[in-house]
From Swiss-Prot:
It comes from Homo sapiens (Human). Disulfide bonds: none annotated. The gene is MC1R. This is Melanocyte-stimulating hormone receptor. It is found in: Cell membrane. Changing R160W: Probable risk factor for developing melanoma; unable to stimulate cAMP production as strongly as the wild type receptor in response to alpha-melanocyte-stimulating hormone stimulation; reduced expression at the cell surface. Changing K65R: Only minor effect on internalization rate and protein half-life. Changing I120T: Shows a moderate and not significant decrease of cAMP production to NDP-MSH stimulation; shows decreased responses to low concentrations of NDP-MSH stimulation. GO terms for cellular component: cytoplasm; plasma membrane.
Length: 317
């Protein structure tokens, strides 16, 4: 792999500095004595990837097994799990190859390793982009189900969902390939950052609007039962906590990665930014943690899915 030192798990494209930007690599004395670098061990990185790989594979298998789950909503959830599976799988593969190379158990020509590195980079980037897209698609699907409940099944049909899924996958592969090919252009990094911010704003606006509507609905029910304040406030607090957790996890897991991209453009040679650059492996680990958390938030809350999952696990034994 085209990797060096403590950051050997950087995507090949992000392990190099764009030619339009000053050199990213900082010497130890440039980053300062107080520079904090969180080391992610090979074992931890590999373990997180394997847990995410197994968990998301179970989600995909469960949805595929049960025909009752072949709906637009579960189609998006299944594709989110598949994206997270690819994110984890590509990082597990890269880590395994690196460990085998370091141990001398694997010998390969530089050209072969470079091609493998490029393939892994494209898979990782495309799965990251598609994962963000499917998180947004799930938010849009839930929004339509609440605000257009009577027309939901005519608006969100399975053929339309499949076309949306196909468009997301094709766009993710195309743009990730362009990203790998033109990683030395600042515009590419800015586009990725803008895309992340757009997904964050989209999810925040939709979920906040859904929470407001749910609170209004609870308030109306409370009025009918003459118990407005306790019910409304309790429901609003629970909804606010749920929303905070959902958006907080998304921002915590994805934010550092895109902060890294932003700082590459804004301050590639600043000592403080250099400290942040040193923790890129941590940022990748956080994205894999998000891949572990996603099924808990979007999939396993379904009683039907949990029941089918038990059947899948029983059959596997």
């Amino acid at each position: 792999m085209a990797v060096q030192g403590s950051q050997r798990r950087l995507l090949g494209s992000l392990n190099s500095t764009p030619t339009a930007i000053p050199q990213l690599g900082l010497a130890a004395n440039q980053t300062g004595a107080r520079c904090l670098e969180v080391s992610i061990s090979d074992g931890l990185f590999l373990s997180l990837g394997l847990v995410s790989l197994v968990e998301n594979a179970l989600v995909v298998a469960t949805i595929a097994k049960n025909r009752n789950l072949h709906s637009p909503m579960y189609c998006f959830i299944c594709c989110l799990a598949l994206s997270d599976l690819l994110v984890s799988g590509s990082n597990v593969l890269e880590t395994a190859v690196i460990l085998l190379l370091e141990a001398g158990a694997l010998v390969a020509r530089a050209a072969v390793l470079q091609q493998l590195d490029n393939v892994i980079d494209v898979i990782t980037c495309s799965s990251m982009l598609s994962s963000l897209c499917f998180l947004g698609a799930i938010a849009v699907d839930r929004y339509i189900s609440i605000f257009y409940a009577l027309r939901y099944h005519s608006i969100v049909t399975l053929p339309r969902a499949r076309r949306a899924v196909a468009a997301i996958w094709v766009a993710s592969v195309v743009f990730s390939t362009l990203f790998i090919a033109y990683y030395d252009h600042v515009a590419v990094l800015l586009c990725l950052v803008v895309f992340f911010l757009a997904m964050l704003v989209l999810m925040a606006v939709l979920y906040v609007h859904m929470l407001a509507r749910a609170c209004q609905h609870a308030q109306g029910i409370a009025r009918l039962h003459k118990r407005q304040r306790p019910v409304h406030q309790g429901f609003g607090l629970k909804g606010a906590v749920t929303l905070t957790i959902l958006l907080g996890i998304f921002f915590l897991c994805w934010g550092p990665f895109f902060l890294h991209l932003t700082l590459i453009v804004l301050c590639p040679e600043h000592p403080t930014c250099g400290c942040i650059f040193k923790n890129f492996n941590l940022f990748l680990a956080l994205i894999i943690c998000n891949a572990i958390i996603d099924p808990l938030i979007y999939a396993f809350h379904s009683q039907e899915l949990r029941r089918t999952l038990k059947e899948v696990l029983t059959c596997s034994w």
